[in-house]
Regions:
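Walker A (P-loop) ATP-phosphate-binding motif of ABC ATPase nucleotide-binding domains
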Residues: 2
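Hydrophobic anchor at the beta1->P-loop junction of P-loop NTPases
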Residues: 5
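P-loop (Walker A) phosphate-binding loop of NTP-binding proteins
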Residues: 8
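Conserved lysine of the Walker
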Residues: 13
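Conserved substrate/cofactor phosphate-moiety recognition/catalytic segment
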Residues: 18, 22-60
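Loop/turn-to-beta-strand initiation segments
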Residues: 71-74, 96
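Conserved phosphate-donor/acceptor-positioning beta-strand/loop module used by diverse small-molecule
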Residues: 90-110
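Small-molecule kinase domains that catalyze NTP-dependent phosphoryl transfer to phosphate-bearing small molecules
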Residues: 113-154
């Protein structure tokens, strides 16, 4: 199973994903690392990605998900904002979504505090506009400590209990 930690930029996908992967003893991957250079340049310039920009990235992730499932469980941090994106990534099964949900104000503050990341805070509005909250995900509020979020996820997915 690949557990996909999803949500808008700044919600804590990477941090929660890394802690969850360590807790489960599985590999962690960050979908940001699979963006083509053209997408990175576009985001760094403050231009939102469109569905055509995202399609090759999502197809690449879908292939990696098949590979990761063959190797065992894994955790992937990925925005997965739209249902159509989730459909591409999960079309061959073996995925479970964990949605990190937070208010725009909380997320904006996190982005303002962040350094060394290529996602400008002013793209947040476009992410919230694109966001189609999932109906088939574990929903975790981001306004609680990281360890509490991970404990909630572990309880919901039923693996990794000490």
């Amino acid at each position: 199973m690949v557990y996909i930690i999803m949500g808008v930029s700044g919600c804590g996908k990477t941090t929660v994903g890394e802690v969850l992967a360590e807790r489960l003893g599985v590999a962690f991957y960050d979908a940001d690392g699979y963006h083509p250079d053209a997408n990175r340049r576009k985001m760094a310039a403050g231009t939102p990605l469109n569905d055509m920009d995202r399609r090759p990235w999502l197809e690449n992730l879908a292939e990696h998900i098949v590979q990761w499932n063959a190797e065992g469980d894994a955790v992937l941090a990925c925005s997965a904002l739209k249902q159509s994106y989730r459909n591409i990534m999960g079309r061959r099964g073996g995925v479970r979504y964990i949605y990190l949900q937070g208010s725009r104000d909380v997320i904006a503050q996190r982005l303002d505090d962040r350094t060394g990341h290529f996602f400008p805070a002013d793209l947040l509005d476009s992410q919230f506009a694109d966001l189609e909250p999932p109906t088939n995900a574990v929903v975790v509020a981001v306004d609680q400590p990281i360890n509490a979020q991970v404990e909630q996820i572990v309880g919901a997915i039923g693996v990794g209990h000490a």
